[in-house]
Amino acid sequence: MKTLLQASAACAALLLASPFAHAAEGEPKPYEPLVVTYDSTGTDDAELKALVESLKKAIQSGDVATLKASAAPEVKIYSVMIGFPDAALPDPLSDPEKRPGDQRLDDAAALTTSGDVDYSREDLDGMVVDLFGNALDEGTIGPSKTAKGAICSPAEPVFDRDKALAIADAAGVPSSNLWILSEETEFRENPSADAPVLAKLAAGTIVPFQEGSVEGEDGEGDWYSIVLPSAKIGYALNDISRGFQATSVCYGKVDGKWAVTAVIVPGL
């Protein structure tokens, strides 16, 4: 499911085409590659696993009632920007009306779209299913700094912030051009399938994008370019990179039972 803002490749294209994303300035310099890791601490609880499995089944059948029944009485919503995370962790959005958890899921789902729209009940239900679907689609789970240590789906990447920023500096691009490879990727000397391979980078590698959309030498293909650790420019097809923050559903224990206690919604 990629019907919301969680389609990272589309988001990357939007950001890289914006006035806030720039091609490399000056001559890029070599840098040390950096691969993110994922923490699974606290995720082996049998009752938590059972909750996640029930949510997956509800997503498959479109059972919004089960999804909403999983909400704690109080559900926090964290709104974060797509792109490289700020150093300061966000506070949850204010909830002066103290809306119940199931209604907060509606609020979170509405944040995944742009514009101030009065959605129908049917629309909101579908958006809630999509929200959970996008969060659980990756199949990973782990503690989240953004959600103050709560366990979330998907797992949040763990990395050295200073080392990541050093990569952007070496590449001569803003930190908003940093993305995470979702799979092992070969980068070529030119935007052509016949060009020599300059480097093969592992899944989870943080890469500095130079251009989000590059026309192939044959006029075909959806290429993109990055600054490689060698400081050379490498080209690859079909960007499916990930951002540092995805739409996430987070869990905690309330009165001894696992429940959905928070939602993280990234936006432009």
Task: Go through each PLM region and give its residues.
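SH3/SH3-like beta-barrel superfamily modules
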Residues: 198-241
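Short, low-complexity N-terminal intrinsically disordered segments enriched in polar/charged residues
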Residues: 24-57, 69, 105-106
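Short alpha-helix capping/helix-loop boundary micro-motifs
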Residues: 190-197
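Boundary regions of SH3-family modules and the immediately adjacent low-complexity/disordered segments
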Residues: 109, 115-176, 225-268
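Short, well-ordered alpha-helical segments enriched in acidic and aromatic residues
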Residues: 63-74
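Bacterial N-terminal signal peptides that target proteins for export
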Residues: 1-9
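Short, charge-rich amphipathic alpha-helical segments embedded
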Residues: 75-93
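N-terminal signal peptide c-region/cleavage motif recognized by signal peptidases
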Residues: 17-20
